[in-house]
Each structure stands twice: as C-alpha cells, then as structure tokens.
Amino acid sequence: MISRYTRPEMAVIWEAQTRFKIWFEIEAHAADALAELGVIPKEAAKAVWTKARDVIFDVARIDEIERETKHDVIAFLTHLAEIVGPEARFVHQVMTSSDVLDTCLNVQLTRAADLLVDDIDKVLKALKKRAFEHKMTPTIGRSHGIHAEPVTFGLKLAYAYAEFSRARDRLVAARKEIATCAISGAVGTFAQIDPRVEEHVARAMALTPEPISTQVIPRDRHAMYFATLGVIAASVERLATEIRHLQRTEVLEVEEFFSEGQKGSSAMPHKRNPVLSENLTGLARMVRAYVTPAMENVVLWHERDISHSSAERMIAPDATVTLDFALNRLAGLIDKLLIYPQNMQKNMDRLGGLIHSQRLLIALTQKGASREDAYKLVHRNAMPVWRGEGDFQTLLKQDAEVKKYLSDAEISEQFDLGYHLKHVDTIFKRVFGES
C-alpha cells in the first residue's frame, strides 16, 4: 500500500492494530467455547475479555518480541499474557497458529469485500444516472477502432452498467466463498480440539466453518477471491480505455472534468489530458498482477507450509486497497464526465453516410439482388466516399445498377438515423428493468 492510492476506510482493515484486535477476538471466542465445554475455567475465559477487550495493543512491543521469537503469533500471545496475567495460560489452548491467521485473514477479506461492493454500487449509480441522461444521444459505434454503425452514448454507459452489475454479483459470491473459519488444530483433524469450538468462533466472527481444512484453509478460495478482483479491475480498465479513446483531440466526444487551476503539462499550457483514466489503467494492471501469486498459493505441501504467507501479506492489502481507490476514482470520473453530443454528431457525419452501408446491402437483397451483387454495388460506391470523393447517398442515386432495385426515395430511407435506435428502450429495460 502507498498513501497516494489508499483510502482510510480500506487501509484500517489492514493496519496492525486491526489485525491484533481480530486475533484477540478469535482467541477469546475460542476460550469461551472451551470454557463451555469444561476444558478451561469459565472465570479464566471471562478474565481474558475483561482485561483485554478494550486494550490498544502495543504494536512496537509485539514487533520487539517477534524479533526474538521469529514467530508473529507467539509474539502476540506473549504480549497478551503481559496484559491478561495468569489467565493467559488458557489462551490458545489446543489451537495452532493457522487457526488464528487464516480465520483473521478471511475476516479481513470479507470486510474488504463489503467495502468493494459499496464501491461498485457508487459506480453503478453514476453509470445509471449518466446513461439515462444520454439514453438517446446518438454517437458512432466503432469496431476495430473504425466507424461502424450508430449507437447512443447511453448504450455505451449501459454496457458498462451491465458489466459492473456482473462484477458485483461475482464479488458477492467471492465474499461468500472466502467467509470461512478454521479452528481445527494441527493438520486439521480436531485431534486436540472439539469441532464445536470452531462452530462457536465461526458464529461469533460472522463466518462459516470450513468443511475440511488441512491446518490451513484451502487456498483455492483465496484464488477465486483475487481472480474476481482481477476481473473487476479489467472492467475498470475497459471503461477507462474507452474514455481515453473518446477524449482524443480529433475525437473529443467526452472529456474528463478539468478543475479550476488544474494543469495538464509542465511544458505545454494548452494540454487537458485524460490523466484519471490513464491512472486507472495503471492501477488495474497492478490488481491483475496480484492474481498470479494467489493462484500459485493454491499449491501447498501436504497439510501445510507457509509459502503462501509472504505473498498474502502483500497481495491482500495491496489488491483490495488499490481496487477500492480505483473504483471510487472511476465513480467520480463518470459522475463529472463532460459529454459533447455536437462532436458525436460531427464525427458521425465525417464519412458521408457510409455508416448506413449495411442498410443498403439489406435493402438491395430484399429487392431481388443476390447478396454477392448487392455487396459489390454498395462497396463500389462506398470506397470513393472513404477516400473523400463524394457523398454516399448521391453516388448511390447516380448508379444505374442500384436504381434497378431502389428508387431515390428508397435509397434516402436507408439513411434514417432513428432506424438504428429503435430498440434502445428495449435494451435499457433489459439492463435497468422497468425504471
């Protein structure tokens, strides 16, 4: 995590103090369950809560102990014993470090997912608002970067809305998959600990018991979680890239909001660059980069090793913090996006009507021309216009072979922009419902 791309709401989840608070809660809830089962005295379990529930753990002290013990959980338990006193000997009874570490990580990941779902909701809200504003604003659709046929700018935003709706569903599913708890002891057999302890801790921490753990929670769950973040990041970049292309000087159909006093270049005072979209492109690359180590973490030796640990200490905070920042930036970008319908119309007109070529092709075939002949007739009139030599509709009306099939009025009819937009309402209802 670097502060430049970190929001405090997400950062707090990954702070050391938060981690130690979660560790304490796991240990204390486990002690409660062990007390109910008669394994440890009930007074000892109560004392753990009473003496440490509201404590601010001394992170520096824990780090000091870890430098000697070379073990983070033992360092924490040692510091906890300094706070709790004699009753601390009943803490971590019959548990192993992975019980604490893995359960804590999943608590943090579920909390992060909750924030990310809220972030996606902000993006969806902004997209829906702007989509309805420009539901019928005509613009050119492009394939391979080349003018194809008319769409509306509202449809472009509706595409993104549908994509982020899917992203939200995937994230909710990934959150559910990662929300498991393991308090199963060494090698996961419950040999030293009653499974009811795990069930109690799971309920207390708003998790579900891991059906079968091998001392660690299986990392395919985490791989799915981070893969989901990677897909969401790809969606962020797809929309950011669309904005970057549409802000090109020679296109200028949209533009990022440019605030009073903002500067675009240290050398060229006229510049207004799509810096937010470019920033999002870079952030998305980083989130996707964390997917690979998450996948590789699935492969652990036998019942456990800690090859996953060092990677997760980096990818868990970095991926969630970065995506959180990116989604919030994207929501603001869409909300303030400057949209230029007049430039959209001007760009549509640049090719002299060629964007209606498919309608002419279909009209000719419906009047009796073979598809091959119809294609040749449309193509031979389109290519001069592509080179800037005339107007498509005019050339078609001057072509004797075309006139065998279509009258001037029928040719003109094929250039109706509204024809391309007749099902926009239907598409919007599919995407947004009846609202």
Descriptions of predicted regions:
Residues 336-405, 418-421, 426-435:
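C-terminal alpha-helical interaction appendages
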Residues 198-291:
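Acidic, glycine-rich loop-and-beta core segments that form the ion-binding/anion-interacting portion
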Residues 110-121, 128, 158-161, 165, ...:
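Short amphipathic alpha-helical segments with heptad-repeat character
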Residues 286-369, 377:
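Long, amphipathic alpha-helical stalk/connector segments used for oligomerization, subunit docking
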Residues 189, 202, 209-216, 345, ...:
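A structural signal for small-residue-enriched, beta-sheet-centric alpha/beta enzyme cores
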Residues 132-154, 253-257, 261-271, 302-311, ...:
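Glycine-rich cofactor-pocket loops
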Residues 38, 280, 323, 374:
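Residue-level signal for inorganic ion chemistry
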Residues 1-184, 190, 194-200, 209, ...:
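A helix-coil-helix interface module used to build multimeric assemblies
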